Amino acid sequence: MSSAPNASALMKIGQLKKPYGIKGWLWVFSETDDRTAIFDIKPWWMKTATGMKPLTVKAWRQQGTGVVAQFEQIPDRNVAETMNGVTLWVEQDILPEPAEDEYYWSDLVTLRVINEQDEYLGDITEMFETGAHAIMRVAATSDSLDKEERLIPWHKQTVVKVDLTEKTVLVAWPSDY
């Protein structure tokens, strides 16, 4: 068994949800664009109360609009019921480089968000999916324009420019919206 990786070298790729059936299968929420691409990335690590533990996919399939999976470490429904909410991680260095104008969400979290009026709105604290598109949660900081938290869509009409070197995202988003 391999030793647990350094937490700072990990990227969250999904989360285990409620059990499916009686044989230890679980619904899997994938944070990858293609929901099934998560199964092409190995090895997985799960974050537990006692630290990072390996998690090995035994089988998976699409089920309705979601995805379910069975794992070596989860033998039955009783164990599966304790896994709801467990987050799934992979080592960042095994992931392919993103294409031009594509980003891993983990690379966007902590970036400064500035609008076209050159107003600093805050820092990205979270990226999440709504179904229609991704959303940036932008939290105020001590030196941002105001103390407002903003939910800004990650969309080509909203995101003007991303500069990972400068750690900024330029958005077409007025401060009073």
Swiss-Prot record:
Q: Taxonomically, which superkingdom?
A: Bacteria
Instruction: Please indicate if the UniProt record lists Cytoplasm as a keyword.
Output: yes
GO-annotated molecular function: ribosome binding
Gene3D superfamilies given for it? Answer: PRC-barrel domain, RimM
Q: Which InterPro entries would you find in this protein's record?
A: PRC_barrel-like_sf (IPR011033), PRC_RimM (IPR056792), RimM (IPR011961), RimM_N (IPR002676), RimM_N_sf (IPR036976), Transl_B-barrel_sf (IPR009000)
**Which keywords appear in this protein's UniProt record, sorted alphabetically?**
Chaperone, Cytoplasm, Ribosome biogenesis, rRNA processing
Copy the domain comment: The PRC barrel domain binds ribosomal protein uS19.
Q: Which family does it belong to?
A: Belongs to the RimM family.
Q: What is this protein called?
A: Ribosome maturation factor RimM
* The organism of origin for this protein: Psychrobacter arcticus (strain DSM 17307 / VKM B-2377 / 273-4)
Q: What are the leading ranks of the lineage?
A: Bacteria, Pseudomonadati, Pseudomonadota, Gammaproteobacteria, Moraxellales
